[in-house]
Amino acid sequence: RFSGLWVGLTTMKDTVEATSVVNGDPNRMKLVTPQFDMPEGGLNIRLQDTPHLQEARMIDYKRFAAEAFSHANKMDKRMWGKRGAKIGIAAAGKNWLDVIHAMSLLNIDENEAERLGITLYKIGQTFPLDMKGFHEWAEGLDLVIVVEEKRKLIEVQIKEALFSDTHRRVYGWHKGGGAGMEHGEELFPTRGALDPIWIAEKLGGIFIEE
């Protein structure tokens, strides 16, 4: 509601076909309203709204409002590792759980990851990505690995954020490139689903090389 945008959720059988006891208290979360320069009338729907004005608000304000809300409420978090790490792994949703499982298959826990110079970033809002939070996490990294199945929404935003950075590499769909097999080994395909064993095999190979 803060940004006036629709919110979409990608659901998977691995999570929706499960049961759990949850806390339904509406006050269990304390949301922060960020400082943001709103246009006249705010960002939500109103009477006598023209397509031109709707488009202008979308492009000039709404994406940035959603990003500001994400940053203020820390939807994306550094989970493992600390500043000074050299390898960063970013993932969201089920892929985040798969990464944790994959790390356990490699016998790497939080302490071992810190010793090896590895940091993990859990993304709660995949678009728009909290660029300020991402840059804070990625500072000093030599390599960012994006574990993401299907369409590469997070990877594209990260590569855009680091476009002019010649020191940091980004691996995702492919190893060291964009679309197309000529850009290197395929790591995390856009077809099918990823699983912890596949991810562990790819991450293990990268860790050995690095």
Regions from the PLM with identified roles:
Residues 1-210:
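Flexible, low-complexity linker and terminal segments
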